[in-house]
Amino acid sequence: MLSLVLIFMSVQLRLVGSEDTVASLLRHQAALASMGNRRHYQPAQPLLTGSRLSGHGWPRKVLGLYVLLADDTEKGFESDAVWTPELYDWQKSAANVLFFTFIHPATMEIPPAFVSLAASRGTNKNGAVPADTLIIFAIGGYAYSLDPNPWHWLLSREAAERMAEKVATWPATFGCDGVDLDLEEGAGQHPEAGRNLIHFIRRLKQLQPGLIVSQPAYGYPQVPAETEVINASWDTEGHSNNLADSVGLMVYYSTFALNYVKNYAQGASQWEGFPVTVNVPTNKILLGAHGQTSSADIHLLATETLRQDLLGIMVWYASVKNGFQYASSWDASTNNDSIQGYLQAMSLFRG
């Protein structure tokens, strides 16, 4: 049913001329795509692990999986639940980046599941993270942008910078290589959120210059805080201002993400009043992919990534071996065709 709705919407997007209508349809698509998607979580016990921060940033080409590790609505997998996640073998081979989902923005505490899986990196134990795989901690998400709203640490510059000082300790304490700032509708529309998120990133980069900061965004830019971060992170020539390191397109159906690259790569040359006013370098843009995207569509996303010199592909979502699921039809881990597609894409990226 979801696929039929999205197909219908895709046809509509080709027909409508109104930007308001396009924005409305994309908002609805994003809501559908976030079924079970961005949900609730909570705290954890700190555990000292090694950091891999080297200042080198993203791999040349990324295949990143959003893996489900904590959700306060899933019994036994709440943010404070103590359990030991294990990766599938295919995830270790197909991905060079893992996005751990999600940290609750009200607490900004690290779930024990994050700590456990991050600490496994390079140990070669069953289900462990490979030594050369990057770990990105995702903050917020769709549900956590609706509640809490606003995020308390984005209400002032002082609060944002204090939170940056806390987050700057995460690489050494928990072993992450970056953060994914998934501030969506709701808290992302709060009038002070964008400028204070910029203060947060700037302070974070002062303290941890090598920390990766990824900024997800809808295909059509419609969350003001996300757009403010993107506009502050680059200029019209594509030069970096040392804030966000990438933009991830939250367009997950088929290969549709390719249709929205121009909204960011050529933002400065869109129509007058367009929300994005800068040109994001193509090699800083990640294409969104539904977990169960067909291998043929994954191949097209991968070849276009190479042809257009895009950063890579981010996949929503993949369950871990002993974890939980949202809608099974979105789970990459239960579709052999998709798994083969991601393995082949990584082979292409590695050359």
Pin down the residues of each PLM region:
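Low-complexity intrinsically disordered segments
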Residues: 4-6, 18, 46, 130
